[in-house]
Design a protein with these regions (language model features):
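Short linear sequence signals and composition-biased patches located at protein termini or domain-edge surfaces
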Residues: 153-203
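Extracytoplasmic beta-strand-rich oligomerization domains located immediately C-terminal to a leader/signal peptide
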Residues: 26, 30-134
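Alpha-helical hydrophobic helix detector
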Residues: 13-29
């Protein structure tokens, strides 16, 4: 055995340490990149899911809108003298971002009557409120709203009319439109994203 076995020089040790540091830095940056990508994907997924939930709930409210339930039976033949039934769907919108949608729909539980639902936009958040179901008029007013969708920077709505064209409301109210188009712009981590939802055609 060679009693004078040669060891590592100081330079070799420093080079080895430097190489290990470089490898560790590359590995850390790779892990950090994966972590950031995963966080962005989770954020995008949550934003997409919240948008889908909002649109699905809106579509369900419209699908369950009242129709003949609000019409009193004509038992005495004096139909023309009876007060007109309230609109099942009432929309007010403007180019300034004003948006309010009122819906009278069937209650979630069959046999509980009708309930009022209201959607509106305030300070970049879309809210939804609903009143207690009832089988008597007047129906209870919607309670305190629940935030459904945040980050809304613009919301435009148009209605479909009998002339087969879309029309803006310019701040006016439209009752029982044939169809509703909603264009929504959100601020996300990837910038502004635009979405379009069409509900209808309504009977």
């Amino acid at each position: 055995m060679n009693k004078h076995q040669r060891g590592f020089t100081l330079l070799e040790v420093m080079v080895a340490i430097l190489l290990m540091s470089i490898v560790s830095l590359i590995a850390w940056r790779g892990l950090d990149s994966v972590t950031r990508t995963d966080a962005r994907l989770r954020e995008n997924t949550e934003q997409t899911e919240s948008l889908l939930r909002a649109f699905n709930q809106l579509e369900r409210d419209m699908a369950l809108r009242a129709s003949i339930e609000m019409q009193e039976p004509d038992l005495d033949g004096a139909q023309n003298d009876r007060p007109q039934a309230p609109a099942a769907v009432s929309l007010r919108a403007a180019d300034t971002g004003e948006f309010r949608l009122d819906v009278i729909r069937s209650a979630a539980v069959s046999g509980e009557g009708l309930q009022r639902v209201r959607w509106w936009l305030k300070d970049g958040t879309l809210y939804r409120a609903m009143g207690l179901p009832s089988d008597r008029y007047p129906l209870p007013a919607p309670k305190e709203g629940v935030a459904v969708l945040g980050g809304v920077v613009d919301l435009q709505a148009r209605i479909w009319k009998a002339d087969n064209e879309w029309h803006t409301l310019d701040g006016n109210r439209e009752n029982d439109p044939k169809g509703i188009e909603i264009r929504l712009t959100r601020e996300t981590g990837q910038g502004r994203e635009e979405y379009r939802k069409v509900v209808g055609l309504l009977d």
